[in-house]
Amino acid sequence: MIAFDGKSLAWERVWQDDPPLDLSAIVARRVYVDARDGARIPVFIAHRMDLKQDGANPTLLHVYGGFNVTVEPFYLGSYSSFVNRGGVFVDAGVRGGGEYGEKWHEQGMLAHKQTTFDDTIAVAEWLVRERYTSPAKLAVEGGSNGGLTVGAVITQRPDLFRAAICQVPLLDMIRYHKFLIARYWIPEYGDPDQEDAFRWLLRYSPYHNVRTGVNLPETLVVAGEYDSRVDPLHAKKFVAEVQSNPGQLSPFLLYMDFDSGHGTGKTQQQRVVDRDYELRFLMNALQVSGNR
C-alpha cells in the first residue's frame, strides 16, 4: 500500500504483504509472436529458471480474446504447483481482446473472429518452434469467450494440442443467441439469423466442426448448472457430440458443477476443489510428475 502526501508531494510505502508463494526460482518475461498477417501478439511466459528448451516441457497456454477485455499478466497461486514441477505457463493477448485498444478488439470480432483463433494457433506453433514444448506436451485453457477460443482451436488444429480445459464455454454459435442473455452478444459475434453472419459463424462454431473420424485432444469441459450467462447446454451438447464420434479415442469429459453458475456463487473452498480437479486433469494429461 502506497500513500501520497499532498503537502510534501511525496510517495511513501506504508504496507506490503508478504507473497504467499516462494517465487524466487520462477522467471517471467514478455515476448512478441508474429501472427499470420504480421501483427505482433503480446505473450507472457512464466517458468522455472532452470528450464531447458528441449521441446519436452509441459506447457499451458491461457487465452481469452474477446469483448475488448484486456487480460493483464497474472500468476495465480493455483498454477505454482504446475510451474514448480517444470511446467510453462503462457498468457497470450490474442486479438478480440483490448490489449491494444479498440482496433485490436475489432480485428477479432464479427466477420474477423477467426483472427482470434489464428493468433492462438500462431502462439502455440511458436512455443513448439522455440522448443518450449511439443504438441504432445501442450495444453490450452480458456473460459467463457475463452472457452469458445479453446473449442475452436482444438477442432481446427487437433494435432497441435495434447489437452484442453474448456470452461463455461460458448460452443454452438448458430443458436447461441437464443438462450439466456446471449442475444446481447450479437454485436460481438454477429446475428446467426442473418445470412452473412450465419456463414462466418458456421465456419468456426466448435459444435458444428466436430469431424467424423477425427480424434480431438484430451479435454475437460467445465460448466455450471446455474450459469445465467452462458447456458450449460453448450458444454453438454458439445461433449455428447464428441463422445458419439467413433473416431474419438482420447478422453473427452464433462465436469458439471450443480451448485454454481458462470464461475460465481462458490466459496473459496469450492474454488480450491474445482481448481485442484482441473490441475490434476492437466498434469495427468501432460504426464507431469514430481513433488514440488
Residue ranges: model-predicted function:
Residues 59, 83-93, 253:
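A fold-wide structural signal in alpha/beta-hydrolase
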Residues 91-292:
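Active-site-proximal cap/loop segments of hydrolase catalytic domains
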Residues 1, 33, 43, 61, ...:
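Conserved hydrophobic/aromatic pocket- or pore-lining residues that grip, position, or stack substrates
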Residues 46, 62-63, 141, 222:
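Short hydrophobic segments within beta-strands
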